[in-house]
C-alpha cells in the first residue's frame, strides 16, 4: 500500500511555525480499536493513490497511530489544512465514510475531519470525497483520544461518535471510546455550547453512555425522549437477560437529522435493534 506519509497533507510544515509539543504518551495505552490487516483491493488502492494527497492529513506517528510529536489541532492548524476558518466538526470512527462525506457535501460552509483507523475505511472515505470533489473534508488515521489530548480549547464546533465499537465483554468496557477522560478532553476542545453527538444500537452501550455522561460536570443532556434501560450490564452473549433486570428511565435524543442512514445502521434496524441517540452540550464547568 502507498505510504500515507509520502502523499498526505502536512499542515504543521505548511504553517512554518513552532507549536506546543504533544505530551508524552504512556507506553501502554488502552485502545478503542484492534489493528487488523489493512490490505486494499485495487479500487481502494487507486482511491488512496489518487486522493490521499488531497484529503489525508500527515499527523500520525508509529504503528499505534499516535499523533506525531509537535502537532496541535488548533485554529491555525484548521486554517492551514482547510484554507479557511470555518467551524470544524470531527467524526470519530467514520467507517466507510458515508455519513461524514454526505454531511460535508450538504454543508460546504463547515469543515469536517474524519477520524478512522482502518485502511479500507480511510480509502473508501477518500474515494467518496474525491468522486464529489469536496474541498471541506480532511481525513486523519490516528487514535482519536490521542488527537483530542492535543486539541486546543475552543477548536471544535461538534464531535460525532456514531455506532462505536461496543466492546461487549465486561473486561473490555475500558476500551469503549466514551470515557470520562475522553469527555474531559472533548469538553476542552469544544467551543462554548458545542455538542457531542453519540449514537449506538447496543442497549448495554447506551447504559454505559448514561453512566459516563449523565451528571458529569460540564455537560448538559439535551435529550427529550424517555427510554427505559436495565440498571446492570449483562456482558457479551447475555443480552436476553436484560429484559428481566430492574429498569429505570433515562433521557435521550430524537434521531439526529444530520446523520444519514448508513448501511451499518440499516443492518442494526433490520436485526430489530433500537437506536439510541444522545446529545450532550458542553457548558461551563462548576
Swiss-Prot record:
SUPFAM superfamilies on file: S-adenosyl-L-methionine-dependent methyltransferases
Claim: Lipid metabolism is one of the keywords in the record: no
Entry GO CC: tRNA methyltransferase complex
Pathway note: tRNA modification; N(7)-methylguanine-tRNA biosynthesis
Function, in words: Catalyzes the formation of N(7)-methylguanine at position 46 (m7G46) in tRNA.
Reaction equation(s) it catalyzes: guanosine(46) in tRNA + S-adenosyl-L-methionine = N(7)-methylguanosine(46) in tRNA + S-adenosyl-L-homocysteine
Protein name: tRNA (guanine-N(7)-)-methyltransferase
Enzyme class: transferase
Family matches, as HAMAP family: tRNA_methyltr_TrmB
InterPro entries, per the entry: SAM-dependent_MTases_sf (IPR029063), tRNA_(Gua-N-7)_MeTrfase_Trmb (IPR003358), tRNA_methyltr_TrmB_bact (IPR055361)
One Pfam family hit: Methyltransf_4
EC number: 2.1.1.33
GO molecular function: tRNA (guanine(46)-N7)-methyltransferase activity
Keywords: Methyltransferase, S-adenosyl-L-methionine, Transferase, tRNA processing
Organism: Bifidobacterium longum (strain NCC 2705)
Organism superkingdom: Bacteria
Chain intervals for the UniProt region annotation (Disordered): 1-21
Keyword Methyltransferase: yes
Family that this chain belongs to: Belongs to the class I-like SAM-binding methyltransferase superfamily. TrmB family.
Residues engaged in binding substrate: 169, 201, 262-265
Active site residues of this protein: 165
Binding site for S-adenosyl-L-methionine: 91, 116, 143, 165
Amino acid at each position: 500500500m502507498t505510504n500515507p506519509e509520502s502523499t498526505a497533507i502536512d499542515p504543521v510544515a505548511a504553517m512554518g511555525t513552532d507549536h506546543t509539543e504533544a505530551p508524552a504518551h504512556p507506553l501502554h495505552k488502552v485502545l478503542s480499536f484492534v489493528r487488523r490487516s489493512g490490505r486494499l483491493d485495487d479500487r481502494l488502492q487507486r482511491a488512496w493513490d489518487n486522493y490521499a494527497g488531497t484529503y489525508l492529513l500527515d499527523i500520525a506517528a508509529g504503528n499505534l497511530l499516535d499523533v506525531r510529536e509537535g502537532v496541535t489541532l488548533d485554529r491555525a492548524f484548521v486554517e492551514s489544512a482547510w484554507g479557511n476558518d470555518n467551524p470544524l466538526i470531527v467524526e470519530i470512527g467514520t467507517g466507510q465514510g458515508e455519513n461524514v462525506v454526505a454531511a460535508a457535501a450538504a454543508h460546504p460552509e463547515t469543515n469536517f475531519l474524519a477520524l478512522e483507523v482502518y485502511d479500507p475505511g480511510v480509502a473508501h472515505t477518500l474515494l467518496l470525497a474525491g468522486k464529489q470533489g469536496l474541498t471541506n473534508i480532511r481525513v486523519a488515521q490516528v487514535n482519536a483520544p490521542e488527537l483530542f489530548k492535543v486539541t486546543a480549547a475552543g477548536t471544535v464546533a461538534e464531535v460525532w461518535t456514531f455506532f462505536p465499537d461496543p466492546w461487549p465483554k465486561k473486561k473490555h468496557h475500558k476500551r469503549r471510546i466514551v470515557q470520562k477522560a475522553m469527555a474531559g478532553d472533548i469538553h476542552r476542545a469544544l467551543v462554548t455550547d458545542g455538542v457531542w453527538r453519540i449514537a449506538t444500537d447496543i442497549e448495554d452501550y447506551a447504559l454505559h453512555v448514561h453512566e459516563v455522561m449523565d451528571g458529569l460536570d460540564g455537560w448538559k443532556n439535551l435529550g427529550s425522549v424517555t427510554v427505559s434501560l436495565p440498571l446492570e450490564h449483562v456482558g457479551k452473549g447475555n443480552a436476553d437477560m436484560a429484559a428481566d433486570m430492574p429498569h429505570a428511565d433515562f433521557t435521550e435524543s430524537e434521531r439526529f437529522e444530520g446523520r444519514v442512514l448508513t448501511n451499518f445502521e440499516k443492518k442494526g434496524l433490520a436485526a430489530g435493534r433500537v437506536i439510541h441517540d444522545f446529545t450532550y452540550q458542553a457548558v461551563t464547568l462548576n
